[in-house]
Amino acid sequence: MRITNVHHLPLAIVEAVKNDPYPHGQTGDISATSLIAPPQLVALRRQHEADLEEDAADRIWSLLGQSIHTILERAEPSAITERRLFAHCAGWRISGQADRIVPLDLEYETIHIEDYKTTSVWSVIDGVKPEWADQLHVLQWLAAENGYDVRGLSIVALLRDWSRNKAKDGGNYPQAPV
């Protein structure tokens, strides 16, 4: 995929977008995210990867989401951050990256998996997105295949457009930005 700079963003931002550390193409036969996506979309992306373009401005929220993952590495030293797990199923090597694996015992055998999302309030106002839950369940399966006893799953949504005034109105509007 080619990253463009239609909006003339500062070079540092464009280069940060281009240098995404996510290991595209090095994750196995299929990643958890691709596994839950529509098959035609995955096939077309793979077939036309070299022809695809995306503007750096359209990747800003993704870039900021990556910064959250870096910050999380400073939290709770016993937790494992950004761990890629692999397992085989029906001849496929499936992979998924857990944002945080929190050990519930000293042997790191019993765990809780946390997935962090930097998103809009409107993405959570009616509940968890089905694809987020699906991704967590793939991670749960991968963890179990790697010998972990998964006792809990959490999606932690960081709401970039949260408003204290709207929260005061009540209803199903989130009462905090996390």
Report residues per predicted region.
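Metal-dependent nuclease catalytic cores that hydrolyze phosphodiester bonds in DNA/RNA
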Residues: 1-113, 120-133
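An active-site-proximal "capping" alpha-helix that borders the catalytic cofactor pocket
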Residues: 132-144
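Short acidic/polar capping segments at secondary-structure boundaries
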Residues: 118-121, 160-162
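A short secondary-structure junction signal
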Residues: 115, 124-126, 164-169
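A structural signal for short, well-ordered beta-strand segments and their strand-loop junctions
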Residues: 80, 112-115, 150-157
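Metal-dependent nuclease catalytic regions and adjoining charged, substrate-binding loops involved
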Residues: 1-8, 141-178
